[in-house]
């Protein structure tokens, strides 16, 4: 293996817990929510659909088009998630937009504990790295804030390249940017969409779920690279 591709959400970082997310969004709207009410509302908002959260329980017909295109266009990503949040009656004016903006800011995310050590280790080993993400906004500033931007050689974001995982084209684009053959590339992710890299010719490693901010086994990527190099 000569290069590694990493998924972003659920692999390198995770969104903050739903109650913290809601409290922060409400505060932006000038509302200080009582924690018990926040817990109830947060559960309803996550069920409706949160960027970085589980799939929504249902997609209202009026949001079907923007939902289908959420990872291809910035405007669709915003419209989909603010629209889903607006289906929950929270009684707080402006909350859907505030919650969406929270997800777009680095404060709304927690890098996994082994993110920096793994990226530094791969850089020391001379292994180029790309981040390949289905997403509707720019995550590069997150890596700058976390002090690891210089350890990533390329970002391949679905809304910028017009392709989403598991389409092999997005993985091939990443390999091309790194100048490596797919057959000599490892894709590291946490969902079946990431495993779509197999169709592009890449080896694939899927990591288990881990709590935000904890170690989630990223170091296994470096171990696999080392093992293939003998």
Regions found by a protein language model. Give the residues of each.
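N-terminal helical cap/lid subdomain that shapes the substrate entry/recognition surface
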Residues: 1-116, 121, 125
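Asp-based, Mg2+/Mn2+-dependent phosphohydrolase catalytic module
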Residues: 1-6, 30-31, 91-94, 116, ...
């Amino acid at each position: 293996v000569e290069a590694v591709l990493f998924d972003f959400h659920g692999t390198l970082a995770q969104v903050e817990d739903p109650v913290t997310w809601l409290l922060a969004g409400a505060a932006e709207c000038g509302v200080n929510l009582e924690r018990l009410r926040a817990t109830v509302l947060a559960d309803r908002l996550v069920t409706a659909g949160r960027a970085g959260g589980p799939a929504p329980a249902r997609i209202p017909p009026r949001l079907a088009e923007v939902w289908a295109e959420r990872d291809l266009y910035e405007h669709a990503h915003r419209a989909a998630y603010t629209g889903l949040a607006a289906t929950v009656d929270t009684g707080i004016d402006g909350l859907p937009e505030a919650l969406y903006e929270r997800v777009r800011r680095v404060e709304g995310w927690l890098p996994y504990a082994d993110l920096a050590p793994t990226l530094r280790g791969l850089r020391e080993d001379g292994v180029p790295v790309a981040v390949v993400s289905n997403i509707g906004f720019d995550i590069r500033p997150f890596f700058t804030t976390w002090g690891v931007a210089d350890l990533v050689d390329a970002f391949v974001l679905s809304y910028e390249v017009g392709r989403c995982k598991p389409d092999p084209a997005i993985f091939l684009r990443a390999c091309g940017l790194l100048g490596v053959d797919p057959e000599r590339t490892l894709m590291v992710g946490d969902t079946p969409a990431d495993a779509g890299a197999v169709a592009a010719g890449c080896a694939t490693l899927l990591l288990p779920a881990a709590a935000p901010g904890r170690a989630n086994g990223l170091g296994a990527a470096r171990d696999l690279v080392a093992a293939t190099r003998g």
